[in-house]
């Protein structure tokens, strides 16, 4: 039974790693990965996975390392495929912050001293759970780089997460923001209006790690928008 669980979860982790690395390549090539995936999933045997800022939760990351350690009992070689998948998924928080820095460069603003709002800290949508959330790594990187960090998550209002007191409402704070990172695809965030963000934010930079905003509407609204695997618009 444990072998079955490890196999299914490591399979998912590897598929996410594949699409994350594909996203990094497509960004440089100017190809929108979401357009590609929407077309690819029309093929009956294609199992769609989506790129993001990383993989979290109590199962997938842990199970991949369990599989790596299990394999060491039977071979002198490392389980390179699984190890490389973990490396890819674990570098996605860094890439997310790189996208933010790239967007800030457009307005000649350093990340240090910038006010950045992180929307969503749960490792998956519509749950109150931050176990091994990749958003924690994003926040750690932002701290290291001297950003002023604000957090809003509808499941963690007026609490403390990752050493930061969370907001009970994010709209009233938009006017001080130099950037915004969508970290979790909570249903509440799917209805965010790009034009509203443009009208309220001090600097309208949006890093959409879940690709939930229509990038064409973002461009039309005048946002400085970056998605995972979407390139510049």
Annotate the PLM regions.
Residues 1-233:
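Structural/interface elements that position substrates and couple domains in central-metabolism enzymes
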């Amino acid at each position: 039974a444990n072998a079955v669980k490890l196999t299914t979860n490591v399979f998912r982790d590897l598929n996410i790693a594949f699409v994350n690395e594909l996203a990094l390549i497509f960004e440089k090539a100017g190809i929108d990965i979401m357009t590609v995936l929407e077309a690819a999933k029309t093929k009956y045997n294609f199992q769609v996975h989506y790129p993001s800022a990383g993989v979290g939760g109590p199962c997938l990351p842990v199970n991949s390392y369990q599989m790596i350690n299990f394999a060491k009992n039977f071979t002198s070689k490392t389980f390179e495929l699984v190890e490389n998948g973990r490396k890819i998924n674990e570098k996605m928080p860094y890439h997310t912050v790189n996208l933010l820095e790239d967007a800030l460069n457009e307005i000649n603003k350093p990340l240090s001293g910038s006010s950045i709002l992180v929307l969503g800290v749960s490792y998956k949508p519509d749950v109150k759970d931050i176990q091994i959330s990749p958003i924690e790594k994003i926040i750690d990187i932002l701290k290291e780089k001297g950003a002023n960090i604000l957090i809003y998550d509808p499941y963690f209002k007026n609490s403390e997460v990752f050493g930061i007191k969370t907001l009970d409402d994010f709209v009233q704070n938009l006017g001080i923001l130099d950037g915004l990172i969508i970290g979790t695809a909570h249903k509440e965030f799917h209805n965010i209006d790009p034009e509203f963000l443009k009208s309220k934010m001090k600097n309208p930079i949006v890093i959409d790690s879940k690709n939930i905003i229509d990038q064409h509407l973002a461009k039309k609204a005048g946002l400085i928008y970056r998605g995972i695997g979407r390139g510049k618009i």
